[in-house]
Amino acid sequence: MDWTKQIVRYVVVMMLQVLLFDQLQLWGACHPYIYILCLLMLPITLPRSADLLIGAAVGLIMDIFCNSLGIHMASCILIMFLRPYILNAIVSDTDRLNEQICLRAIGMGGFIKYIGLLVVIHHLTVFMIAAWSWSHLWFVLMETVVSSIITILAIIGYNSLKYR
């Protein structure tokens, strides 16, 4: 794996998130967080501690730029903790994945399940912590659904273009 290429790609995705997607307020309830693409596409051969540290670092960077007091960090650590379990539940033979998780490696159905579950968990965590109240539950659920759909479509589009 070419780490320089990966790092440049992740910096570009993070910059797009901060400069473009964070400024985008679609319908007041859509907040696409494409930066989690960086986490979901990490090689599966990384040690578990590295996964969690990278998740914490990416979340911290987003918290700094979004002024969100640890919300993204908590959400990123959670999805990085759950990632291997979800991947093992979806893909029966993780040995065939080599190093990279991509559309081509696990097929469209598996890829959508993998991305979909982790994106929904991330978004639900972000919006629940931000609301910090059960009184806003319906708005949080609406925000989660709309934002997750847009984020999932963006990640699938990116992955389709990348591995064409």
Features from the language model and the residues they span:
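Terminal, non-globular segments
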Residues: M1-R164
